[in-house]
Amino acid sequence: MAISLKVLAPNKNVYQGEAEEVILPSTTGQLGILPGHISLVTAIDIGVLRLRMNSQWKSIALMGGFAEIESDEVIVLVNNAEIGSEINVQNAEQDLKEAKLAISKFSENEKNPEKIKALKEISKAEARIQAAKN
């Protein structure tokens, strides 16, 4: 028995297919989903969705959003997403360096919108790197 999985971003259908198992980065931690899962809606954090089909794992970098789980169907609506195998690791690593440089300009306790933006960019770059390497 398989789960029907759809990952949708505003400008594209990122992934549509079946999976035996799905692991989502929810805002409260990793959420493992198997066929017959209880119905729920959850917020998705910046992180990596992992799906298993035929003993093969595939990773998708997610940039925050929501997921709806209904028994054997998972619909993930995100701000943006990239399939791990399509991510250019060098570009993601460069984005991480730039975000870390941007954050180094602020003190540890400083609250600034630019610092918050840089922290978010670090999370995005790390998710992209992790998805690309898995």
Curated annotation (Swiss-Prot):
Signal peptide: none annotated. Keywords: ATP synthesis, CF(1), Hydrogen ion transport, Ion transport, Membrane, Thylakoid, Transport. Its main location: membrane. Gene3D superfamilies: F0F1 ATP synthase delta/epsilon subunit, N-terminal (2.60.15.10). It is found in: Cellular thylakoid membrane. One of its GO terms (cellular component) is plasma membrane-derived thylakoid membrane. Transmembrane segments: none annotated. It is a peripheral membrane protein. Belongs to the ATPase epsilon chain family. Produces ATP from ADP in the presence of a proton gradient across the membrane. PANTHER family: ATP SYNTHASE DELTA/EPSILON CHAIN, ATP SYNTHASE EPSILON CHAIN, CHLOROPLASTIC. F-type ATPases have 2 components, CF(1) - the catalytic core - and CF(0) - the membrane proton channel. CF(1) has five subunits: alpha(3), beta(3), gamma(1), delta(1), epsilon(1). CF(0) has three main subunits: a, b and c. This is ATP synthase epsilon chain. It comes from Prochlorococcus marinus (strain AS9601). The lineage of its organism: Bacteria, Bacillati, Cyanobacteriota, Cyanophyceae, Synechococcales.
